[in-house]
Every structure is written in structure tokens, then in C-alpha cells.
Curated annotation (Swiss-Prot):
Assigned protein family: Belongs to the phosducin family.
Full protein name: Phosducin-like protein 3
Alphabetic keyword roster: Acetylation, Angiogenesis, Apoptosis, Chaperone, Cytoplasm, Endoplasmic reticulum, Phosphoprotein
Organism (species): Homo sapiens (Human)
Subunit structure and binding partners: Interacts (via thioredoxin fold region) with KDR/VEGFR2 (via juxtamembrane domain). Forms ternary complexes with the chaperonin CCT complex and actin substrate, leading to inhibition of actin folding. Interacts with XIAP (via BIR 3 and RING domain). Interacts with HSP90AA1 and HSP90AB1.
GO cellular component, one term: endoplasmic reticulum
Modified residues (Phosphoserine): 43, 234, 236
MF annotations from Gene Ontology: protein folding chaperone; vascular endothelial growth factor receptor 2 binding
Modified residues (N-acetylmethionine): 1
Length: 239
């Protein structure tokens, strides 16, 4: 049987009569082959795009030169994403520093990085309470750098009456400061109240919907209401 794609005079006549379909040009065949290769390449890239770094290493013997260039691009991207994730989650605890570490840990902490510094001293109960609360907040907000330092190692002769003190920094600049026990409300301070206070500085994105510490006016009104109710109950019993 004669090949209908053969380049013969008879086949040319049959094509002119419409009996055979037009013969595809070499250029068209090449274009089709290139399109098939492109689709195949996209499929290969898509497959490897979904792989982990370890899987890419395992399959590198299957790559041709074009594959290797595409895969190297994805490998670099995945490595950058992994490093960014590690950077974002590299804290998660309160770091102890001294004065000599201040520049490196605070001033040069990094671009876009919030730093919360607690100046404290041993033997001050409220300082101990805040350190405890900060440990929980550091785990909750691992992208924020929580640090603590004995006050006089950072600021010589810093008065104890100013403790506890919290400074909030962004890129080395102070964005907020909380100085002295009255600012924190004394030993009744809860972790949620401290979280809310720090969130107002912009350092952390709290999931609390409202300030957990009631304004002093609300506290006084509640106290007055309780006193009135108690008096009414007492009067009723007297009758």
C-alpha cells in the first residue's frame, strides 16, 4: 500500500483533487513537536514544583539540561521560603541579655523586626510575674523578639522604683515604653492584659477582641452597685 504522506507526483494529484488531505509542511510538524515538548515540559515542571527539597534531590538524575535549569529555580525558591519560615519562627522564648549585647540584639535586631525588652531585677515580685507572662507571649508570638535584662546591666544606676520597665522597639527605634508598677496595675496584672497593652504599641497582633482590663470607672460602678444591693438585702432582713 502506498504511503499517503510520501512525496510523490501521484499523491500530489490526489491532494489537489481533495482525495488526500494536504501534506503538513515541515515547519508545521516542527511547531507541533515544539508544542508537545512545551506541554510535556510544563507537566514536568508542575510535577517537580510540588516536590520537597529532599524529593528534588532524589529525582535529579531524571532531569535533562532544561529540566535542571527549571528545577534549580524552584529549588532556590523553596530554599528561600524555608529560610524565611525559619527566620519567622526562630524565637518563641524570652532571651536573656546584658548591656554588652544591647546593640546587637536590639539596635541591629533586623529590618521589620519588633523587639520587646523587659528591664527587671531579682526579688521584685511584679518583675517575676511579667517574666512569666512574657514567656507565654513569646511562645504565642514567635515572630516577635522578646528579651529581658537586669536593669543596671543596660542602664547604670537605673532606679528600682522604675521597675518593671518594658521598652518596645522597631528597627532600633523606641515605639512604646511602660515604666513602673502603676502602669501595669500591680500584681493583679494578667497575661491577657499585658498582651493587650503590648498590642496597642503595634508590636503584636492580638486575637483578643476587647481590653480584658475594665476601665476604672466600670470597676467603681460595679463596686457601688454591689454595695447598694448588699444594703437593700440588709434593710429587707431588718424589716
Amino acid at each position: 500500500m502506498q504511503d499517503p504522506n510520501a512525496d510523490t507526483e501521484w499523491n500530489d494529484i490526489l491532494r489537489k483533487k481533495g482525495i488526500l488531505p494536504p501534506k503538513e509542511s515541515l515547519k508545521e510538524l516542527e511547531e507541533e513537536a515544539e508544542e508537545e515538548q512545551r506541554i510535556l515540559q510544563q507537566s514536568v515542571v508542575k510535577t517537580y514544583e510540588d516536590m520537597t527539597l529532599e524529593e528534588l534531590e532524589d529525582h535529579e538524575d531524571e532531569f535533562n539540561e532544561e529540566d535542571e535549569r527549571a528545577i534549580e529555580m524552584y529549588r532556590r525558591r523553596r530554599l528561600a521560603e524555608w529560610k524565611a519560615t525559619k527566620l519567622k519562627n526562630k524565637f518563641g522564648e524570652v532571651l536573656e541579655i546584658s548591656g554588652k549585647d544591647y546593640v546587637q540584639e536590639v539596635t541591629k535586631a533586623g529590618e521589620g523586626l519588633w523587639v520587646i525588652l523587659h528591664l527587671y531585677k531579682q526579688g521584685i515580685p511584679l518583675c517575676a510575674l511579667i517574666n512569666q507572662h512574657l514567656s507565654g507571649l513569646a511562645r504565642k508570638f514567635p515572630d516577635v523578639k522578646f528579651i529581658k535584662a537586669i536593669s543596671t546591666t543596660c542602664i547604670p544606676n537605673y532606679p528600682d522604683r522604675n521597675l518593671p520597665t518594658i521598652f518596645v522597639y522597631l528597627e532600633g527605634d523606641i515605639k512604646a515604653q511602660f515604666i513602673g508598677p502603676l502602669v501595669f496595675g500591680g500584681m493583679n496584672l494578667t497575661r491577657d492584659e499585658l498582651e493587650w497593652k503590648l498590642s496597642e504599641s503595634g508590636a503584636i497582633m492580638t486575637d483578643l477582641e476587647e481590653n480584658p482590663k475594665k476601665p476604672i470607672e466600670d470597676v467603681l460602678l460595679s463596686s457601688v452597685r454591689r454595695s447598694v444591693l448588699m444594703k437593700r438585702d440588709s434593710d429587707s432582713e431588718g424589716d
